[in-house]
A protein has these predicted regions:
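Short, charged, intrinsically disordered terminal tails
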Residues: 173-176
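Conserved alpha/beta-domain cores
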Residues: 1-151, 159, 171
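Active-site-proximal glycine-rich helix-loop-beta segment
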Residues: 160-162, 167
């Protein structure tokens, strides 16, 4: 909710592709989905079903990244890695006609211990690779591996990250 899209944007904004990152509440879909090119943080079947229903009602296919939960913190959202395989099977069976699965987004445990971060990224990579292997449907579109943030992006790149999130590096630390 930090970014408000307003009517009458300057012409240079026409080519901007907005990604939504963070926990998306189902009651906020109508405020977000019309404006974004990718939802990077689909963290539950409930949210996936709601996005698919919104896409059906609005005749729009929504691009998403699935967010598996592999970090040590219980406060982080996400699918169990085994749930990702079930979602992929449901997609193959045609359940999600208004969703284009484009990859995986994940976060490592918030720690200074590089070995923990590496293990988290290794596990995320395994989930990503298994999802890609699960069906030929996903080999082309399912190509985004969004891991890494300002503190660990260099390690993420070693593990094949295709997108990194550098908000703190660019804008500074948040003050809550």
């Amino acid at each position: 909710e930090e970014v408000r899209l307003e009517r009458g944007e300057p012409d240079y904004m026409a080519d901007v592709q907005w990604h939504f990152i963070g926990h998306l509440q189902t009651n906020k879909l109508k405020m977000v989905l019309p404006y974004v090119s990718l939802v990077q943080s689909v963290d539950s079947v409930r949210l996936l079903d709601a996005i698919n229903a919104w896409g059906s009602a609005n005749a729009k296919v929504i691009n998403v990244l699935l967010e598996p939960h592999i970090a040590a913190e219980e406060t982080k959202q996400g699918f169990d890695p085994e749930e990702v395989a079930r979602v992929m099977k449901d997609a193959i069976d045609g359940k999600y006609r208004f969703i284009r699965f484009q990859g995986i987004m994940g976060m490592a445990t918030f720690t200074d211990d590089e070995s923990v971060i590496r293990e988290d990224f290794r596990r995320l990579r395994a989930v990503f690779d298994e999802a890609r292997r699960s069906s030929p449907l996903f080999t082309d579109d399912f190509s985004e591996f969004s891991i890494g943030m300002s503190d660990d992006y260099r390690i993420a790149i070693e593990y094949g990250s295709t997108m990194v999130r550098l908000g703190s590096m660019i804008f500074g630390e948040r003050n809550y």
